[in-house]
């Protein structure tokens, strides 16, 4: 057991129930870990007393039973971890690997990240996305505040790669809810849709998407329709 030092706590490092111990979350954006960083963290972890690395179902890895100094070191090694909830968005592997996947869910997530980075959009108010390549639950789209699952959309009588937008899901205890279909958007328009949503959120006083949606659901539905 280490000495308690709560100055170490931040969005990735948190205190455990055991006095003086901390855990570190490593959530690489899109679930794609930097192999060198991950191996370096694991190589360091095996030299420590009773420290474990546990894989989470949302593409994150947790290093547990760390002292404050050890937690700082692990966080430093894995500094490519997602910096906010939006960057912690999850997707299944998608159609490039999955034999029954309809669309490339992981590719969509990467396209979204790349587009918003290129545009210099502040993503701190956007929620975590949950993206599945098909109606199955591998990307847990049903529980996302914003979820997507792979689909097809006819545009000028031609089938286009698209994703069904699922609205209002929740995994939080006491407010558990499966989201409902709110639109069908061609995949190439989704990054621009999220750019527009982020710009609206950043101009609003509400602290995050969930709070904004409570009083602006009509505006949100209109935005979805504008991109359908």
Language model features by range: what are they?
Residues 74-77, 193-196, 212:
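Generic alpha-helical secondary-structure signal
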Residues 147-206:
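Mobile "lid/hinge" segments at catalytic clefts and subdomain interfaces of large enzymes
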Residues 27-158:
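Small-residue-enriched alpha-helical segments and adjacent helix-cap loops
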Residues 201-203, 209-228:
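Radical SAM enzyme core and accessory elements
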Residues 6-10:
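Intrinsic, low-complexity N-terminal interaction/targeting segments
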Residues 18-22, 54-57, 86-94, 167-179:
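Short acidic (Asp/Glu) and glycine-rich catalytic loops that position anionic groups and cofactors
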Residues 11-32:
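Short glycine-/aliphatic-rich beta-strand segments at the starts of folded cytosolic domains
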